[in-house]
A protein has these predicted regions:
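Bacterial Sec-dependent N-terminal signal peptides
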Residues: 1-23
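Extracytoplasmic
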Residues: 22-267, 275-282, 286-421
């Protein structure tokens, strides 16, 4: 009887292994997994896939993740009249497109020798018309093992890549101030990134890389009124400006909740460390003030960004956190990284406490496992780091806890000078 039970278990295991090892077809949509990685003005990624593909110097790269080595027979679901080159590493295939309608076009077989992200490049060689054609899907047949890529998920969010966060543990009691230091390493400096240093339950405060000619220090507070349109907020629930720093722009924002926004155009530099100081204090009348200060390391002075009043709110500092995100879907193939160090909290009584514990979390893009290029952790010099994008292979599980040694000394702040800003 016992032998029969063991035999049944072995047969079941063999059946599961056989089913799991069955070759599969992986259909990778270009609209969610493709990028123009060279000469971006010569092709576009749209809901139809690769379109407006006119420049032979443009390269379109398609990414997907495989969990084990395998061979794969590649095809394209494409249309057009042209010759294109399809490359995997050093192996290239010349492919002729000869159809006005979308059809499956064989490419060739590749040998994928290790688990991780696979990159397939497309480049135009010659064309009979204005365009090299349109590519809707990359198809990989006879693949063994599991795969991950943007599928049954928003192309927009999938192409942006996963946002990653660090939540810091506060001491007991009421916290009024949060202090954090941020450094963007040269290798992590990527346009359209938000390196957020001092987040809180009702908003955030950090640095952005907006364009080749513009960088910002951004501070935003959400309204207590839940809407995506700031024009819908009733007057008694609007964020009110109390103080404004020199050269700081004040406005509204929407699409992810609505509220008050402020930013200072400031040419922060990769490799330099900048200080962020955030105050949250109830006013005793059912409202709370939020005040953000930025230490301009290059000028060696504190700057006031803004002070806002949030109505119908009675809170001290809650949920201090940092995050890293890419806000351009065209840039999701590039990696970005940031270091955070020397975190301190100051109680309403004026006592500083060194914060040493952080918890790593991520957004829905990572939770859905459509992107696996997300990380957080410790640096060798006792700081925390966040990294995302660029299709690297090593990810960190949601909820992983990190610890840094309680080194450093409490921030030296001239409180009276801050009040005069």
């Amino acid at each position: 009887m016992k032998f029969c039970h063991v035999l049944k278990c072995l047969l079941a295991l063999l059946l599961c292994t056989t089913v799991f090892a069955q070759p599969q077809q992986v259909v990778v949509g270009v609209s969610g997994n493709g990028y123009v990685t060279r000469q971006q003005d010569g092709a576009r990624i749209t809901q139809r896939g690769v379109t407006h593909w006119t420049n032979p110097k443009s390269i379109v790269s398609i990414y997907f993740y495989l969990h084990q080595p395998t061979t794969a027979d590649l095809s394209l679901y494409a249309k057009g009249h042209s010759e294109i080159k399809v490359s995997y590493g050093k192996k290239g295939f010349k492919v002729n497109l000869q159809s006005d309608d979308f059809t499956k076009v064989p490419v060739g077989s590749i040998d994928i020798r290790q688990a991780g992200y696979v990159r397939i490049d497309l480049q135009g060689v010659s064309k009979s018309g204005e365009s090299f054609g349109e590519i809707k899907q990359l198809i990989a047949d006879n693949v063994t093992g599991k795969s991950n890529y943007v599928k049954d998920f928003s192309d927009y969010w999938g192409r942006r890549g996963p946002s990653v966060h660090l939540g810091y543990a506060l001491p007991e009691g009421d916290t009024e101030w949060f202090y954090n230091e941020i450094t963007v390493p040269k290798e992590g400096e990527t346009m359209h990134s938000y390196y957020m240093a001092a987040g809180f339950g009702e908003g955030y405060f950090g640095m952005q890389y907006n364009s080749p000619t513009e960088r910002r220090i951004l501070f935003s507070v959400w309204s207590p009124f839940d809407t995506q349109n700031p024009k819908e907020i009733p007057d008694d629930q609007k964020i009110k400006l109390l103080r404004q720093g020199k050269d700081v722009h004040i406005g509204e924002f929407g699409n992810e909740g609505s509220g008050g926004q402020s930013y200072l155009k400031y040419p922060w530099k990769a490799g330099n460390t900048y200080k962020f100081l955030m105050q949250i204090r109830p006013d005793g009348n059912g409202n709370t003030t939020y005040t953000a200060y930025f230490y301009a390391t290059d000028e060696k002075e504190w700057k006031l960004i803004a002070s806002f009043l949030r109505p119908k709110t009675n809170t001290w500092y809650k949920r201090p956190h940092s995050f890293l995100e890419n806000f351009s879907p065209e840039q999701g193939y590039l990696s970005r990284e940031v270091f955070f160090g020397n975190q301190w909290a100051r109680s309403k009584e004026g006592k500083w406490s060194r914060l040493t514990d952080a918890t790593f979390t991520h957004d829905a893009t990572a939770s859905a496992q459509v992107r696996l290029d997300y990380q957080g952790g410790n640096t060798k010099d006792n700081r925390f780091y966040l990294k995302m994008g660029g299709f690297f292979n090593e990810s960190v599980p949601m909820g992983t806890k990190f610890y840094c040694k309680p080194t450093g000394k409490e921030p030296e702040i001239d409180w009276e000078a801050l009040k005069q800003l």
